[in-house]
Amino acid sequence: MNKCNLLVQILQCKSVKTTSNENQIIKLKARFKKRNKVVAIDLLIWNRQSLEIFKLLKKFDYIIIEGKLHRSETTDIKLMLNQQKDLVFSTSRIFKYKSLLKNKDIDLFIK
């Protein structure tokens, strides 16, 4: 797993599932800020959040996702084929991205 931060624009929140061990999996369709490629992202969130927080994600232009990226063989194959990518990301924090000039982030939720 690689620790990293993603700056993405949320295009669509497809689904929210709760697993048996109380984790939440959110399927998002997003676009990276520096690239125009569309990405399907699975966010694994260890603490349960209310649906209102996920509705807030759609309202923001860009968000910063902090956590660890899980690599798998299917991800590597899709990267080589240059198609829509699927990423699985363990989330520790999600920030609202304002502007680099204001240099302020608002913490939405913390692990």
From Swiss-Prot:
Ranges where the SSB domain occurs: 1-98
Matching InterPro entries: NA-bd_OB-fold, Primosome_PriB/ssb
PROSITE patterns referenced in this protein's UniProt entry, alphabetically: SSB
Alphabetized UniProt keyword annotations: Chloroplast, DNA-binding, Plastid
UniProt keyword Chloroplast present: yes
GO cellular component: chloroplast
UniProt keyword annotation of DNA-binding present: yes
Localization of this protein: Plastid, Chloroplast
Signal sequence coordinates: none
Molecular-function GO terms, alphabetical: single-stranded DNA binding
Organism superkingdom: Eukaryota
Protein name: Putative single-stranded DNA-binding protein ycf41
Gene symbol of the encoding locus: ycf41
